[in-house]
Amino acid sequence: MNPRRPYPVIFLCRPSSVASSKLASTFMISFLVKKTLSSNTVNSPRGTVRSISRIRNMVSLLLLPTIYIRSLVSYNVYLPITNLEVFLCLDPDVVSIPPPRVCSIASLFILVLFLFCFALRYYVSKLINFK
C-alpha cells in the first residue's frame, strides 16, 4: 500500500480466465457488502444519526459493474475502495492502467453513477426533512 494513501487498496493481477475474474468480482461484492453492513454511524450536531461510511460504501457497491468490466481486461487492475481518482484516471502512480478507450468509458460510467447517487441522496434527504 502506498504510504501517501491510507485507504485500502486491492490488487487483482491479470485474471487468466473469465472464471477467475468472476471469482474476483464475487470477492469484491462480499467484501463491500460486509463493509457496508458493518459501517459505523456518526452523530451530527443536529442530533440525527448519519452513516457517512455507509454512503461511501454504497457508492462503491454501485461501482461494481465497472470493477467487473475492468477485471475482464487482461491488464493489472488497481481498485481503490474509498477513492475515485484511479477510476477517473487522475492518479499518476498507477503503473498499468487499462487502454484509454476502456478508461474513458469507465470514467464516464462512474461519473454518471456518482451524479445519480448524489442526486438520489439529495432527494432522499429532502424527503426526510419534509416529514
UniProtKB/Swiss-Prot annotation:
Protein name (Swiss-Prot/TrEMBL): Putative uncharacterized protein YNL324W
Keywords: Membrane, Transmembrane, Transmembrane helix
Localization (cell): Membrane
Native source organism of the sequence: Saccharomyces cerevisiae (strain ATCC 204508 / S288c)
Chief localization: membrane
Membrane topology, record value: Multi-pass membrane protein
Domain of life: Eukaryota
Keyword Membrane in record: yes
Transmembrane regions listed in the UniProt entry: 61-81, 102-122
This protein's GO CC annotations: membrane
Note: Partially overlaps FIG4.
Keyword Membrane assigned: yes
